Amino acid sequence: VVIATKFGFAFDENGKQTGLTSRPDDIRAAVEGSLRRLRTDAIDLLYQHRVDPEIPIEDVAGTVRELIEAGKVHHFGMSEAGVETIRRAHAVQPVTALQSEYSLFWREPEAEILPALGELGIGFVPFSPLGRGFLTGQVTAGTQFGEGDIRASLPRFEREALEANLALVGLVTKVAERKNATVGQVALAWLLAQKPWIVPIPGTRRLERLDENLGSTDLDLTPEDLAELDSGSASVQVQGDRYPEAMQRMIDR
């Protein structure tokens, strides 16, 4: 078992998120709290959840380095960080992994992030590798997202954008039917085929979906399959922003 956790958000006395904080004292307090709650002596992988523009990344990386030297943390990770910030952090404390969104539904990391990670020897941990459920074939033009479902606030899932984006699901479905696999398995297998140092983290609440996701590791996509998915997804102009403006401002670029 590898234990990964994060620091980087500030909360009030009621547990409500109030913003970002990567102040050294707050990092240390977050780690102590995580160790206590997890009942462990060390955290395998400690991520900065979001880059705090108020705190130099060198100070953040230096604090994590001290925690590693103290044996409380084993590896340093970052999340939603841009290339320049990653390089600066890596110069102080080697970064083991970067978390960010990546899938057939969101291929922006291919432009700058993936080349930089390959150069620096940093692993990539894509979250939402199934496009928040979009790449499972279970989301349709008529899908209604309930209260508390983050997709209800995401521009890509607004009705007009959703209807246009379903063209992407159609091309993945075509490959899935040919391979006798599910749409989600094809989407995950495509990710796994991109780089050997990519480890997607699909979330699920259901055991059968976990089994389905694991099945993607046995799915062999041929060069022709991959080329079809690459060219097909490139031809679909995904509609709608990834996040609302307020959330987008918390991403380091």
Feature-to-residue mapping (PLM):
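Local beta-strand N-terminus motif with an aromatic residue
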Residues: 1, 40-43, 73, 95
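A short acidic, helix-capping loop that chelates divalent metal ions and anchors anionic groups
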Residues: 10-17, 209-212
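Beta/alpha (TIM)-barrel catalytic core signal, keyed to glycine-rich beta->alpha loops juxtaposed to Asp/Glu
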Residues: 51-231, 246-253
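Short, acidic/polar
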Residues: 22-37, 82-87
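A short, structured active-site edge motif that brings together acidic residues
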Residues: 1-11
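Active-site groove signature of glycoside hydrolases
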Residues: 35-53
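Active-site mouth loops of central-metabolism enzymes
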Residues: 13-28, 54
